[in-house]
Structures are given as structure tokens and as C-alpha cells.
Swiss-Prot record:
One of its GO terms (biological process) is protoporphyrinogen IX biosynthetic process. This is Oxygen-dependent coproporphyrinogen-III oxidase. It is an enzyme of class 1 (oxidoreductase). Residues 268-303 are annotated as: Important for dimerization. It is found in: Cytoplasm. One of its GO terms (molecular function) is metal ion binding. It catalyses: coproporphyrinogen III + O2 + 2 H(+) = protoporphyrinogen IX + 2 CO2 + 2 H2O. Disulfide bonds: none annotated. One of its GO terms (cellular component) is cytoplasm. InterPro entries: Coprogen_oxidase_aer (IPR001260), Coprogen_oxidase_aer_sf (IPR036406), Coprogen_oxidase_CS (IPR018375). Its main location: cytoplasm. Keywords: Cytoplasm, Heme biosynthesis, Metal-binding, Oxidoreductase, Porphyrin biosynthesis. Its EC number is 1.3.3.3. It comes from Rhizobium etli (strain CIAT 652).
């Protein structure tokens, strides 16, 4: 989807809105981390004799005079081989070569951005990998963006008819249908288009939703409507993904399943390093490199 021209101008209470968004993202982080630790505790199948994982949090600040920072929350456990749940709130100025690509930054390079980003790589190949992020960005304009997508690593489960796929899609659809400012059909198609490995001519997973540059007019609810929808995307994810994990994490798997999982993880690496907009944004705005690249899986192979 082509980037739209967003209206220039900010509401008088933009600072209060920034603070509300930041608090929401950080609260969602804490909710998800607690939920994922509960999944670690609840394992009864393979590897249940191992100690359950716990998140390790690390705060970071931007360097070289740039403003803001964030928190990395990483866990390696018996359910999640690697999962990162990160929040950040950063501000400063876009570099000259990056300004023209960002709405409202061409003539004024100042920006503020806050958000949450999550990628989970489970141990059990029966449990799909997942990605979720939502964010608020402010330049001389303002908008929300984000989404969530599911990546089953076994070919027999990587279908739209699979029960996990249907459950995930339904959760995202409900989150969208409850808000007039959201367009589920467009966001689902955008996700399919965005999470596509062009050099392989194949999708990364089974999809989900993806949206960006959400800036509704005051007549359709404005910032409040956009923020309400973005919160419901986070809530939908926090509800549906643990259900999917619990329905699969006690199942047995084979060495062939593990091999297929590692090969599928290679597609994750290829996408994140070649195409991912968030990775490029973070690296070009002086983000925390360790946090940005923590989305990469811990063990990968290529055939």
C-alpha cells in the first residue's frame, strides 16, 4: 500500500496522548510477559522436567545525544526457545536521507515514537512462531501502526484451514470489526502482501493483520478511535496466542519436525534482514541494535 499524505498539525494535548500511549504499551508488555511465564509453568509434555523460563529485563538508553530508550525483556525457557517482548519510547531527529520517507518529517525532522514489539520462537515445532507490534509515531503529524502475524513452522500445519490459523484470524477479525476506523479485509491483505519473501515467491506464514499510517479524522473519532483500535489489537493477541500455545505445547515431535522448524526459521532471518520496515526504522533512528536484532531466532539452518 502506498504511503498516504497525512494531515499536518497536532492536537493541543498531544503530550498527554503520548503519555497514555507509552503507558499502554508498557502495561501490555507486563501482561504478556506474565502470561508467557505462566505458559512456561504449565508445560506437562516433553521438556517438562526442565526449569521453567523467566524473563530477564534490561533497560537501555539511546546514545550520542539522541533521546529516549526502552526495555528489552528476553526469555529462554522450556516452552519458548527464545522470546523477546520489547518496549521503547524514543525521540530526536530523522537523518536527512530518511526524512522524505516519513509522513510529516520532510520539512521538520523531529519525531517521537513509542511502541511494543514481540517475536516468539517456541521450542516445540507444533507451536507456531508469532510476531506482534503496535506503535504510535509523532512528527508534524501523528499515526498508529502495527499488526500481528502467525508462522506455523510445519508444512502440514501451515494452511488457512488449520485450527490455529482460523483461531488467530478470527481474533484479529473481531478486533477490527469492533472499530469503524479499522478495515479488516484491507489489513489482512496488507499483511499477506507485506510478509512475503519476494526472492522466494512465498509467504512467511499464514498471515494476520498489518496496518500503518492510521490517522482518523475528528469526524470518525480521531486519535481516540485509533488508540482504542490499537489497544484491542494488543488485547486480541494477548488472548489468542496463549490459547494456541496451550493447545500444542504438550505434543510430541520428531527430529524431522525440528529440522523443518529450523529451515522455516531461516525464512524469518531472510525477511527481517531484507524487508522488515521496523528493523530498518530502528537501525536508522539510532535504536538499540541488540533489541532490534533480538527478533532473530536462536538456532537456524538452511538446506
Amino acid at each position: 500500500m502506498e504511503r498516504p499524505e497525512l494531515p499536518i498539525g497536532l492536537p493541543d494535548d498531544i503530550e498527554e496522548k503520548k503519555e497514555a500511549a507509552r503507558k499502554w504499551f508498557e502495561g501490555l508488555r507486563d501482561t504478556i510477559c506474565a502470561s508467557f511465564e505462566a505458559l512456561e509453568d504449565g508445560l506437562e509434555g516433553p521438556l517438562s522436567d526442565q526449569e521453567p523460563g523467566r524473563f530477564v529485563a534490561k533497560d537501555w538508553s539511546r546514545e550520542n545525544g539522541a533521546g529516549g530508550g526502552g526495555r528489552m525483556s528476553m526469555m529462554e525457557g522450556r516452552v519458548f526457545e527464545k522470546v523477546g517482548v520489547h518496549t521503547s519510547t524514543v525521540y530526536g531527529e530523522f537523518s536527512p536521507e530518511f526524512r522524505a520517507q516519513i509522513p510529516g518529517a520532510k520539512d521538520d525532522p523531529r519525531f517521537w515514537a513509542s511502541g511494543i514489539s514481540l517475536i516468539a520462537h517456541p521450542v516445540n515445532p507444533n507451536v507456531p512462531a508469532v510476531h506482534m507490534n503496535t506503535r504510535m509515531v509523532v512528527t508534524t503529524s501523528r499515526w498508529f501502526g502495527g499488526g500481528a502475524d502467525l508462522t506455523p513452522v510445519l508444512s502440514r500445519r501451515r494452511t488457512q484451514e488449520d485450527e490455529d490459523s482460523q483461531l488467530f484470524h478470527k481474533a484479529m477479525e473481531i478486533a477490527c470489526r469492533n472499530h469503524a476506523v479499522a478495515d479488516y479485509d484491507a489489513y489482512k491483505a496488507w499483511c499477506d502482501d507485506y510478509f512475503f519473501l519476494k526472492h522466494r515467491n512465498e509467504p512467511r506464514g499464514i498471515g494476520g493483520i498489518f496496518y500503518d499510517w492510521l490517522h482518523s479524522s475528528d469526524e470518525t473519532g480521531g486519535w481516540n478511535a485509533d488508540f482504542a483500535f490499537t489497544r484491542d489489537v494488543g488485547r486480541a493477541f494477548a488472548m489468542v496466542y496463549p490459547k494456541i500455545v496451550r493447545s500444542n505445547f504438550n505434543k510430541l515431535w520428531t527430529e524431522a519436525d525440528r529440522d523443518e522448524q529450523l529451515i522455516r526459521r531461516g525464512r524469518y532471518v531472510e525477511f527481517n534482514l531484507l524487508y522488515d520496515r521496523g528493523t530498518i526504522f530502528g537501525l536508522k533512528t539510532g535504536g538499540n541494535v541488540e533489541s532490534i536484532l533480538s527478533s532473530l531466532p536462536p538456532v537456524v539452518r538452511w538446506p
